[in-house]
Each structure stands twice: as C-alpha cells, then as structure tokens.
Amino acid sequence: MKIKTILTPVTCALLISFSAHAANADNYKNVINRTGAPQYMKDYDYDDHQRFNPFFDLGAWHGHLLPDGPNTMGGFPGVALLTEEYINFMASNFDRLTVWQDGKKVDFTLEAYSIPGALVQKLTAKDVQVEMTLRFATPRTSLLETKITSNKPLDLVWDGELLEKLEAKEGKPLSDKT
C-alpha cells in the first residue's frame, strides 16, 4: 500500500514537469540567433570568430543553421562540421526543398525559428503548407521531419551545392584558394 501512495505523487510530478517543459520550449524561441548562409568554408567575423551560430545537439560534431531569406528557405544551411576545435562549413545549402505546382515554383512566405532541441521552418502559400523540423536523433544523426499539406499534386525537388571558397572575414575573401 505504501508503494502506491509514493508512486502516485511521483507520477503526477513527472507528468506536470513534462507538460511544463513542452509549454516552455516556445518561451525560448530564437534565444540564440541560428540564421545564416555561409559562403566560405571558414566564415569569420571582424574579430576572427565564427559569423554564425549553428545548432549542435547531443554532442554532435555537425550542426545546422536556419535560412536567412528566400534564397536559403526550404533547407537548413551549413552543414557545419567541427574539425578539431574549428568549425568548417560544407555547403550554403546541402539539401534544399523547392516545391512546384502546375509547372510553377510555389512562392512561399517563410517563418523560421529555433527552440531548444530543434530548428523549425514553416513555408506557407495559398494552397500549400510545408513544415520542416530538424532534430538530432543521436550524436551522429540529425533527422528532418517534413510535413506537406496540399489539395493538388506537387513536384518536389531537392538541390544543393558544396562550398568552393575557402576563407573570409566579414564576407570578404582572405585568399583566392578553393
């Protein structure tokens, strides 16, 4: 009988803390600026620090950014790789989704934000909604969940391109090396 009386309060406390944690995640939207689109493998600011703050989680050695505008929406710019103590970027967009309907590219509005444990993009057009949530599943695996809502058939195209330029400071190249 004592076990039941102890277990019930513990169970209630856990349930309350889990629901409070879920509600609190939205209170921390964009606490850290995770936006950016690197154009160089080593992209530094005026003080030789990284210009961008990629999202890393679970001890991962790779990270991602949120899009900084229409040219990068539909993807998570980066991928940022930790190489010893430095960050090197692999692509401005490694894999970006473009949606076509009736032979025309869908013109989306973008809402992108970070919350603890995830990067989120919501792309909205008249007849099409796309919600993309990127999370880390393990230290070596980031997963992208994509939900697409439309009443008409769509063509989905994934594209990307690796970076070729080596190094810049404040967006200005430090050398012509590739």
Explain the meaning of each model-derived region.
Residues H21-T178:
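Terminal accessory carbohydrate-recognition/targeting modules of carbohydrate-active enzymes
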Residues I3, S19-A22:
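Extended, charged low-complexity regulatory segments
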Residues M1-V10:
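Bacterial N-terminal signal peptides that target proteins for export
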Residues P9-S17:
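Bacterial N-terminal signal peptides
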